[in-house]
């Protein structure tokens, strides 16, 4: 912003939001898993960078993603809102801006570690494979009850996932957004 420089243009090669800055983000996303966390108030370009990821998480206790703070909103709209009401985890996990909310900063890091645990060590390796102690001839009887015969009747897909996936191997992303999808 020129206004913040006393009316003089800063001596930078171009605006902060030049396409080249997001081009590097897109290039990284095509090569490596990109995971981000909001652990405090995030606005502007950092907010764009936060959501330009394969997995994003925000701290329920300390993070907000906002375009303007409570004072600006009150002056412009005449409404008193907290930072959490404007852009806390409840807002952004529901609208799909971020995938998950975690209790605190430590939990954010743990979620990112869990997400990355499904990925290979580097781009030229395959994803990790773990031994399974499930009997190969196991028949999951609960599936007969969970999935209705009438294809027009809704059912709880998470019960199917729990029955089919290895114990503890399902990592859900974006549960608060898009009730008809499970990621």
Region roles according to the model:
Residues 100, 104-158:
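Terminal amphipathic helices with adjacent charged low-complexity linkers/tails
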Residues 2-7, 31, 138-145, 156, ...:
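Gly-rich Lys/Arg/Thr-decorated short loops/hinges at beta-loop-alpha junctions or inter-strand turns
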Residues 29, 65-66, 109-112, 130, ...:
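Weak global preference for isoleucine
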Residues 40, 75, 111, 127, ...:
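A sequence-level detector of short, solvent-exposed, charge-rich linear segments
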């Amino acid at each position: 912003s020129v206004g913040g420089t006393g009316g003089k243009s800063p001596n930078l090669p171009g605006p902060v939001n030049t396409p080249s800055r997001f081009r590097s983000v897109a290039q990284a996303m095509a090569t490596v898993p990109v995971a981000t966390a909001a652990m405090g108030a995030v606005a502007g370009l950092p907010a764009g960078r936060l959501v330009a990821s394969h997995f994003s998480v925000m701290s329920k206790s300390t993070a907000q993603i906002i375009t303007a703070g409570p004072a600006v909103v009150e002056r412009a709209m005449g409404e008193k809102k907290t930072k959490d009401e404007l852009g806390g985890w409840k807002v952004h996990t529901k609208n799909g801006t971020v995938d998950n909310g975690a209790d605190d900063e430590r939990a954010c890091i743990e979620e990112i570690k869990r997400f990355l645990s499904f990925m290979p060590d580097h781009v030229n390796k395959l994803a990790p494979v773990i031994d399974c102690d499930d009997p190969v001839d196991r028949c999951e009887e609960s599936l007969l009850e969970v999935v209705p015969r009438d294809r027009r009747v809704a059912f709880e897909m998470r019960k199917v996932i729990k029955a089919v996936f290895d114990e503890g191997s399902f990592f859900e992303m974006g549960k608060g957004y898009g009730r008809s999808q499970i990621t």
